[in-house]
């Protein structure tokens, strides 16, 4: 028997981001966020969409990017932003997928910051990275290669941080899926478990409208590819086929 699960909450509407984030303060009573994002999104100011809203509701935050060294806080010693950490020996893989070093570094930052919210803000690779960062944050001794190879049982969620996925591109739907890929030079580790599933997904067209035209085209093709693949997969169900056809 196959089962199909999605995040506990899925917001799907143009302009829904502010409404969804209000839950953090007023319903979930959360106060400290670690944002995982793409360095290009940060440098081009797209992350301000998110951080401005967090400032409005009084949720403090730090930002961690795929370059590992971009660690920023909303509460520096004085006004403005300041770098609070750098990861020695950090590297960025040529692969579009996150690598082990990056997710281990992100988990290390999470253990220092002790956030009660983890927010993935970016494309599928950022969301995949955040899934594994959360896994390692809650289970510091977890061995990702061993888990991927089935040599070690998948550790359960421990609830240290509420996990929100906010996609900035269209693609494989990582924000509502229990999968993640971690790439090394000679190997890709594929993880599959509902323990990786975000607690909330926020799909806001206003966020995706910030994409440049070239990325919009590429991510649209990616979404089409994944929808076709999901429809013809031997593991598809009546439910997933309907979703794929609508995509």
Each language-model region and where it sits:
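Glycine/threonine-rich beta-strand-loop-alpha-helix active-site module
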Residues: 98-205
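Glycine-rich phosphate/diphosphate-binding loop of Rossmann-like nucleotide-binding domains
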Residues: 34-53
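Carboxylate- and glycine-rich phosphate/diphosphate-binding segment that chelates Mg2+/Mn2+
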Residues: 179-247
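N-terminal small/polar loop signature for handling phosphorylated ligands or for N-terminal nucleophile
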Residues: 47-142
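N-terminal amphipathic/basic leader segments beginning at the initiator methionine
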Residues: 1-28
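Glycine-rich phosphate/diphosphate-binding loops that line cofactor/substrate pockets in enzymes
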Residues: 18-34, 55-56, 82
């Amino acid at each position: 028997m196959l089962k199909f699960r999605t995040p506990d909450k899925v917001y799907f509407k143009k302009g829904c981001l502010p409404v969804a984030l209000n839950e953090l303060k007023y319903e979930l009573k959360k106060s400290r966020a670690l944002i995982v994002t793409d360095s290009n999104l940060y440098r081009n100011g797209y992350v301000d969409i998110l951080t401005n809203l967090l400032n409005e509701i009084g949720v403090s935050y730090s930002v961690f990017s795929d370059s590992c060294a971009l660690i920023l806080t909303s509460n520096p010693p004085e006004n403005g932003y300041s770098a609070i950490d750098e990861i020695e020996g950090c590297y960025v893989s040529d692969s579009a997928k996150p690598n082990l070093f990056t997710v281990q570094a992100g988990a290390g930052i999470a253990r220092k910051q002790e956030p009660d919210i983890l927010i993935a803000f970016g494309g599928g690779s950022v969301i995949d990275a955040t899934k594994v960062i959360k896994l390692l944050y809650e289970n510091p001794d977890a061995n990702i290669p061993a888990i991927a190879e089935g040599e070690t049982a998948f550790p359960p969620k421990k609830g240290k941080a509420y996990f929100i996925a906010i996609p900035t591109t269209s693609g494989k739907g990582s924000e509502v899926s229990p999968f993640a890929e971690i790439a090394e030079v000679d190997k890709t580790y594929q993880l599959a478990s509902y323990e990786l599933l975000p607690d909330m997904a926020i799909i806001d067209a206003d966020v995706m409208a910030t994409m440049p035209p070239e990325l919009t085209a590429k991510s649209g093709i990616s979404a089409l590819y994944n929808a076709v693949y999901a429809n013809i997969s031997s593991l598809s169900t009546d439910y997933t086929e309907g979703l794929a056809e609508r995509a």
